[in-house]
Amino acid sequence: MRCPFCGYEDTFVIDTREIEDQRVIRRRRECPNCKNRFTTYERIEEKPIMVIKKDGRREPFDRNKLLAGLQRAVVKRNIDNEKLEAIIDEIIANIRKQGISEITSKEIGKMVLEKLKDLDAVAYVRFASVYQEFSSLEEFAKLLSQMKKE
């Protein structure tokens, strides 16, 4: 592999480790020319997940878009980004485990709601109101009464 510092063509590996549940290989490399060290990561190239939108359009799954939606739901709640990232990781793993390459945005929304229900009731209601397109106070009241019963 080419050295990012001096451009020398032939670097060598000094350490190799598996990370992220053995899905990524981290390699520590050294350049014999300039003696600088650097890290590379080797990942399995997975088939992209396509999301089928409400209007029938298909677009690639966007982790950042889902993260932004979760962040809006947890505004001013004591929930750190690591928990949100873990939710997204679990959802992606669940989709991959099913062996599907296409999923509706509605199904993703259901998965998010299941995770938020266990994490934070306020975030759950916020996300549900957008995901289920609430247009009246009655819809909020109905959701809240269902939550009280559970």
UniProtKB/Swiss-Prot annotation:
Co-factor note (free text): Binds 1 zinc ion.
Classification via Pfam families: ATP-cone (PF03477), Zn_ribbon_NrdR (PF22811)
Chain ranges of zinc fingers (unnamed): 3-34
GO terms of biological process kind: negative regulation of DNA-templated transcription
Domain of life assignment: Bacteria
Domain named ATP-cone: residues: 49-139
Cofactor: Zn(2+)
Keyword line: ATP-binding, DNA-binding, Metal-binding, Nucleotide-binding, Repressor, Transcription, Transcription regulation, Zinc, Zinc-finger
One Gene Ontology molecular-function label: DNA binding
Signal peptide feature range: none
Zinc as UniProt keyword: yes
PROSITE patterns, per the entry: ATP_CONE (PS51161)
HAMAP family the record matches: NrdR
Family: Belongs to the NrdR family.
Function, as annotated: Negatively regulates transcription of bacterial ribonucleotide reductase nrd genes and operons by binding to NrdR-boxes.
Protein name per UniProt: Transcriptional repressor NrdR
Organism: Dictyoglomus thermophilum (strain ATCC 35947 / DSM 3960 / H-6-12)
